From Swiss-Prot:
One of its GO terms (molecular function) is aminoacyl-tRNA deacylase activity. Belongs to the class-I aminoacyl-tRNA synthetase family. ValS type 1 subfamily. It holds the Pfam family Val_tRNA-synt_C. It catalyses: tRNA(Val) + L-valine + ATP = L-valyl-tRNA(Val) + AMP + diphosphate. The lineage of its organism: Bacteria, Bacillati, Bacillota, Bacilli, Lactobacillales. It comes from Streptococcus thermophilus (strain CNRZ 1066). GO terms for cellular component: cytosol. This is Valine--tRNA ligase. CDD domains: Anticodon_Ia_Val, ValRS_core. It is an enzyme of class 6 (ligase). It is found in: Cytoplasm.
């Protein structure tokens, strides 16, 4: 048992050193019990690009809740941690750091640059693990993995080679998304589309014979130097006679052909389109159909090359302005049509991507996608929570394109392909024998290795490894909806292809963390929250409680310090209840408490309130477990909160004072036993969510760690509907009296007369048997319970099931004085309403003030109106009493 609980809850003291103690005790490792059912989770590996944000804290908290509960339920649990090398993201960070010293990666060379990246990785991996510790994550560090570990790299090479042998990985020259800042290819889902201000630039391409001009329009006039044709629809009567003739490309003054192609839409624009096969995916296809040259006019950094003539060396956007100016000078510019359009931007660097002809490696997706879709109709399907994300997954799979997997980076898995001077390609898990071979310098997309994470971390391709046989497929994946396409989908099709199984049985999808106003957290808005700052102020348990109760699966959650205050207050309440129970414990052990609780359940000891709280505890255990199984942690948290704060603390703990302050020692022992037992069960129910404080309090009542303690289960012998109904009726009486006191402004300390007129003989007997509880909570001067109670004229009345409750008012208050007080109160709120109404009726204020300021005034108005209306009701009631 640990030291006595401090008088005040201090999360810093409670959490200090606790995580290291858990690690020293090896409580996070799998039990190794072969009779136990395995339950495994692989952590979505965070990028080693920096510190973890609040979204990571949410994601990992949900996983820890799941794994801690399953561990307590006796499962053989494995939560495998690890990190992702995050190719483009990490390389960009390291390049930015080097740039501060005026150094580029090219100055260092590949080997020395990679040394710098490994230093970065070690630095931030240590930071991430420190953050995991502060969050209390119960991961098994003995199995920690990194996506560039040799074992995982072996898996990557094997998958690449096997897919290549099947013809599902190929190399070719196609239009891809190019990031000019990172100088690498990007896959479609690494491109974010943003609406930006732009223009259609209309220009004339003169026929070679000078007879007429054809008007074309483009949003990227700087690519015109790569035009190798213009296209018209072969069924367009306006132009079909021109097919086969030439137009003159302005500025360069070279002839290019007019081709007939269905790509040209007669209904759109002039019906004539310029064809730039090396800079547009649709034009690329037109070029293939008509055997057009592919002219790339840009360098990999987004500057124009020598094929752009006088614009050689200019940045693409500077070239755009210069080209438009030149077109205007030579009379080829028709008009500039301003508009807003969607432009793809690099997810990592934020710059507009450039569609560009490039030789890359691709994964052929058609059969892999078909396999993944078909699997969702089998018993081995992946279950999504909420289920609607299954449709999201299937929709993406049905419309997926081939995946460009090569990246022009240095940090990552180098592609296992080698070339020789004869133009031969060798693809293998190891380098080819002999001289003259040079390995492809590109690396694989980060998501290629991440897609293998659930099984590569378990030892695959060694299918006989203990972890692979025991813990794969994994049980549950927890992740955000923003990476279903990037990661979840790819893990599913790769796992099905290489293991024949789904990678996980369940996928729990959560949303995004937003600020109080519902905005996404970002550096540009300056509204990001560091979870470590929150932990320093409130403790990890309070943050975890907020994150687990913030929303339902698939929904976003709004962070607010007001909610954090509420979380801390709840834990403080638990702390204070625990101290009260322990201070009144008198050396009672948990084993003895369990024996006494069994007697209460059997009806051999205790009173109705003891049986009631055990009944409600039992219901709480059932509902919490049921909602945990559905990953409805918010619902489970709400149930726990209501039981702990409302039923246990506010009612049962207060009701026990009737016994604990009496002289009946036998009853005291029973009451202490129920208190201690219920506290023990509460701590176990709460532990997956708030591990630190529950461990601290658990140490006061039991040996060993709560981490490996048994999770509560429903006990049929605790069911007692009769006791539950009886105590609920007692509570109704007490609440009614309290509410009536408040309505007529009578202090709780003032003794009053209470008359309870019953219409149910059983209830009458029950109230009289438990009259002391009513007295303790209502402070009566006179209390009468009977079917024929005599009721005076001037009373406050309320009705509950089976009884009517009356408070005679003649001696309690002066109705005229109370009416005067209420009228004065009403005038006060009318004044407040007038002031806020005046402000909100000011159009300039509403138009110019910040939205949150206006909303605050509207909230005030709503609050003041509610107070005003409540007083009006009170005045009406008082006037009725006078009559």
């Amino acid at each position: 048992m640990s030291k006595e609980l401090s008088p005040k809850y201090n999360p810093a003291e409670v959490e200090a050193g606790r995580y290291q103690k858990w690690l020293d005790e090896d409580v996070f490792k799998p039990s190794g019990d072969k009779k136990a059912k395995p339950y495994s989770i692989v952590i979505p590996p965070p990028n080693v690009t920096g510190k973890l944000h609040l979204g990571h804290a949410w994601d990992t908290t949900l996983q820890d809740i799941i794994i801690r509960q399953k561990r307590m339920q006796g499962f053989d649990t494995l939560w495998l941690p690890g990190m992702d090398h995050a190719g483009i993201a990490t390389q960009a960070k390291v390049e930015a750091r080097l740039a501060e010293s005026g150094i580029s990666r090219y100055d260092l060379g590949r080997e020395k640059f990679l040394d710098k990246v490994w230093e970065w990785k070690d630095e931030y991996a240590a930071t991430i693990k420190e953050q995991w510790g502060k969050m209390g994550l119960s991961v098994d560090y003995s199995r920690e993995r990194f996506t560039l570990d040799e074992g995982l790299s072996k898996a990557v090479r094997k998958v690449f080679v096997e897919l290549y042998k099947k013809g599902w990985i190929y190399r070719g020259e196609f239009i891809i998304n190019w990031d000019p800042k990172a100088r690498t290819a990007l896959s479609d889902i690494e491109v974010i589309h943003k609406d930006v201000e732009g223009a259609f630039y209309h220009m004339n391409y003169m026929l070679e014979d000078g007879s007429r001009a054809l008007e074309v329009a483009t949003t990227r006039p700087e690519t015109m130097f790569g035009d190798t044709a213009v296209a018209v629809n072969p069924n367009d009567d306006r132009y079909k006679d021109l097919i086969g003739k030439n137009v003159i490309l302005p500025i360069l003054n070279k002839p290019i052909p007019i081709v007939g192609d269905e790509h040209a839409d007669p209904e759109f624009g002039t019906g004539v389109v310029k064809i730039t096969p090396a800079h547009d995916p649709n034009d690329f296809l037109v070029g293939q159909r008509h055997n057009l040259p592919q002219v790339n006019v840009m360098n990999d950094d987004g500057t124009m090359n020598e094929l752009a003539g006088e614009f050689n060396g200019m940045d693409r956007f500077e070239a755009r302005k210069a080209v438009v100016k030149k077109l205007e000078e030579i009379g080829a510019l028709v008009e500039i049509e301003k508009m807003t359009h969607s432009v793809g931007h690099s997810e990592r660097t934020g710059v507009p991507v450039e569609p560009r002809l490039s030789t890359q490696w691709f994964v052929k997706m058609d059969q892999l996608a078909k396999n993944a879709i078909a699997n969702q109709d089998t018993d081995d399907k992946v279950d999504f929570y909420p289920p609607r994300f299954n449709d999201t997954f299937l929709q993406w799979m049905e419309n997926v394109h081939d995946w460009v997997i090569s990246r022009q980076l240095w940090w990552g898995h180098q592609i296992p392909a080698w070339y020789n001077a004869e133009g031969e390609i060798y693809v293998g898990e190891e380098a080819p024998e002999g001289d003259g071979w040079k390995q492809d310098e590109d690396v694989l997309d980060t998501w290629f290795s991440s897609a293998l994470w659930p099984f590569s971390t378990m030892g695959w391709p060694d299918v006989d490894s203990e972890d692979f046989k025991r813990y794969f497929p994994t049980s549950t994946l927890v992740t955000g909806y923003d990476i279903i396409f990037f990661w979840v989908s790819r893990m599913i099709f790769q796992s099905l292809e290489f293991t024949g199984r789904q990678p996980f049985k369940n996928v729990l999808i959560h949303g995004l963390i937003r600020d109080e106003q519902g905005r996404k957290m970002s550096k540009s808005l300056g509204n990001g929250i560091d979870p470590m700052d929150v932990i320093e102020k409130y403790g990890a348990d309070a943050l975890r409680w907020f994150l687990s109760n913030g929303s339902a699966p698939g929904q976003d959650v709004r962070f607010s310090y007001e909610k954090m205050d509420a979380s801390w207050n709840f834990i403080n309440k638990i702390w204070n209840i625990s101290r009260y129970i322990l201070m009144n414990n008198e050396g009672l052990t948990l084993d003895v408490a369990r024996e006494n609780v069994a007697k209460v359940a059997a009806g051999q000891a205790g009173n109705v309130t003891d049986r009631w709280i055990l009944h409600n505890l039992n219901e709480t255990i059932g509902k919490v477990t049921e909602n945990f199984d559905k990953f409805e942690f918010g619902v489970a948290g709400h149930i726990l909160y209501n039981f702990i704060w409302d039923e246990f603390a506010d009612w049962y703990v207060e009701l026990t004072k009737e016994v604990l302050y009496s002289d009946n020692e036998d009853e005291k022992v029973i009451t202490r036993s129920v208190l201690l037992y219920t506290l023990d069960q509460i701590l176990r129910l709460l532990h997956p969510i708030m591990p630190f404080v529950t461990e601290e309090i658990f140490g006061q009542i039991s040996e060993g760690s709560i981490v490996t303690a048994e999770y509560p289960v429903v006990c049929p012998e605790f069911e007692n509907e009769e006791a539950a109904a009886g105590v609920e009726a007692l509570k109704d009486v007490i609440r009614s009296v309290r509410n009536s006191r408040a309505e007529v402004n009578v202090a709780p300390s003032k003794p009053i007369t209470i008359l309870i007129k019953t219409s149910d003989s059983k209830l009458d007997a029950f109230f009289n048997d438990n009259i002391n509880y009513i007295k303790r909570f209502t402070n009566p001067e006179h209390l009468e319970i009977a079917a024929d109670v005599e009721v005076p004229d001037l009373v406050m009345s309320s009705i509950i099931t089976g009884a009517e409750i009356y408070l005679p008012l003649a001696d309690l208050l002066n109705v005229e004085e109370e009416l005067a007080r209420l009228e004065k109160e009403l005038a006060k709120w009318q004044k407040e309403l007038d002031m806020v109404g005046k402000k909100l009726s000011n159009e300039r204020f509403v138009a110019n003030a910040k939205p949150e300021v206006v909303q605050k005034e509207r909230d005030k108005q709503k609050d003041y109106q509610a107070k005003y209306d409540a007083i009006v009701v009170r005045i009406d009631e008082m006037k009725k009493l006078v009559k």
